[in-house]
Amino acid sequence: VTNKNPGTTDPDFYDYLILGSGAGGCAAAHRLAQTGRRVLLLERGKELPRDGPTTAVDPVLRRRDFHSTEPFHFSATAARNDEFENLGGKTKWYGASLLRFTAEEFLADESHQCPPWPCTAAEFQHSYGEAERLLGVRHFPVERDLRTLLDRLHRTDPAWQEEPQPLGLLPEIGNDDEVRRFDGFTLISDHKADAENRLLAPIRHLPNVTILTETTVKDLLPEAGDSIRLGGVRCADGRIFRASSILLGAGAMHSCRLLARYVQRHELAAALPAPELIGRYFKYHIGSLILAISPRAYSDRLRKTISLLHPEFPHSIVQSSAWIDGELIGARLPAWLPRFAIDALGRHAYAFLLMTEDGSHRDNRVTELPDGGIALAYDHELVRPAIQEHQRLRENFSRTLLRAGYFPLRKRIARYSTSHASGTLVATANPQGSVVDSYGRVLGLKNLRVVDASVFPRIGRGNPALTVFAWALRVAEDLAGETVNSGLVTHLNSA
């Protein structure tokens, strides 16, 4: 690929080319669009329909109409692919829980197998604030049933600490039936802040912004005569797009495979400080769901308002989860079970999500199947501290609920679930042990950056979505400044 001058009128040349429209891709596009330079965002999936199926249990949970069909193997065995392919990425389906990492979660914790970030919490504050502003993050009041449950919980074990759960929801959602189907579903309205409606919608009308869906990128391409500098991308349909800067935002399961292909094809291992780490250090959350069953039916509607912390479990969090009912519970149970019993269970169930930060191990990794699908090699035995803490968390919270008068029903989240995947293009405080630096630059290459959770050396104990938004804004801000400075130098030299 031979790139022309950035001032070219070539319709297939862009200043910034972003791969993926999840939290990172959309945040980067939002910031870079403000430069006035040409931005192209490519998304392999479609724009989701707004006529109802994304809020219905059958198409979403039973038929899995919106999940990726790409082959996926977990520990060498074919497994269900939990990835989504759509404009807005996983943020269209998330529960809008938008927590900041604590200052400690940016630091190393060797006992939990956690390396440090390449930047501090203080360096993230501006980006966190900007992300929260764009997403309209707010707290919601605790409803009556949950207040009763929490009071009983505190009386049983005062060590449980309560914090409001920051949410990207509009207040109107509390007065709408959508409150029952916002977590794990995509809303027809914009009551839930996601990457598309908060970050793409305000810029998609701009003349310098192009968004293409159903466009699968197969290969990164080099600049002619210089494979250290990328020139563009080749898509599955043969189209080629060129750009001055390329940003990977395809997610931790995909961005690493694109980079691995490029480095291998162009024999660039010697140019990168740690090419062997591409795809390694995969991590996610060790998770469980516990239903607190009460003799009395619950009437709370929003429910997802509180986080619980305990000093005995410093890498873990318990969050009150969104509405649950018989239809949701039944989607995961055999069809022969009587519906009236499942509906009764749903009326008496309050859901809690338990998450523990995963540790890092180089042998937990993502590679490519021979047919182009995803291969995830992951062994819980390699991250024993995380597994052990989560087991103790489950036992403690279940026991506390039981003593408080609630019967706990427990379900472990599937090991092959990749909803919070991260770490496969790791950035740490040690450049020689990193693929990416503190501003998303792929070390050893000239114009490739990463704006998704692939870079995370730690995932924290809560949902990492806000940190992905903030990271991408930080990277895009730096890239925009770099572009401005480069343009100024060029102007002065030609004057």
Where do the model's predicted regions map?
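A glycine-rich dinucleotide-binding beta-alpha-beta segment and adjacent secondary-structure elements
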Residues: 178-183, 188, 213, 218-221, ...
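Conserved redox-cofactor binding core of oxidoreductases
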Residues: 110-113, 117-217, 414-417, 421-424
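Glycine-rich Rossmann-fold phosphate-binding loop(s) that bind the pyrophosphate
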Residues: 20-22, 44, 250, 453
